[in-house]
């Protein structure tokens, strides 16, 4: 826990034991930055600052959506900023603020072990660095809060900028026909869309929170102006994310259309191949029918000739005068009859 006294000349580090005296003195802005809430930090929030138990509970536990609680002497705000993790996962980095008349308490929400401990401290450290360098001289806790929240929105904007490069890369793959691994492409597509939706949600909810804060009766016109500026920053991030989501949606539609066209062409080629095979099979069947028909036509004469050609001693028909011409007549008639039948059935 860092206890700081921000004055017109800079910033001074103080001890926790000095907090009650600092809050009573009326000199400068008392800034307490709590990287993670432990028993001592919870005691400070409850006993020294005497914050509402519900606000303390929200500061100790993880908030999945931004929150705003307005009290008579302070405002509690919970916000999120994105951090890209493994395999496209987006971590929600939480920052809670108690903004009073003479103090600002910043509490960094429960941190996922997969996130480096320095990541949640970026915005508060950036503001502290600016104060130490003389580039920032906040006169009120709201002005200090404005600087910290502005750093958050810049981080969100940088997050969108990085995802924009991914969107352009996906678009180049699709339009260039360079999708060599569809599974990897779809994974990258989902991760990019997920990241844009996550940061868009954070910015939209942040805009709603700060827009509501502008209507609070307990803040001055200057404070209202700074709050409205933070709302405008969140709204700008949301609009940028919306634009990239629309662009990515166009890439998805183009890719889907490409897949449909390719699938249609493949199906058409398969149908053409099947048709060619069917035509070849039909032609072969016609040939088989013609061959079978002629074989049947010649089978009858062959059968009769074979019988008459048998070289047996006792064959009465060989001694019959009309046997030979009758055999020839039967051969001719049977052949003609078979020819007519096959012709009528279009086998010939």
Regions found by a protein language model. Give the residues of each.
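Alpha-helical transmembrane segments
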Residues: 34, 149, 156, 237, ...
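Short, structured protein-protein interaction patches enriched in aromatics and acidic/basic residues
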Residues: 60-77
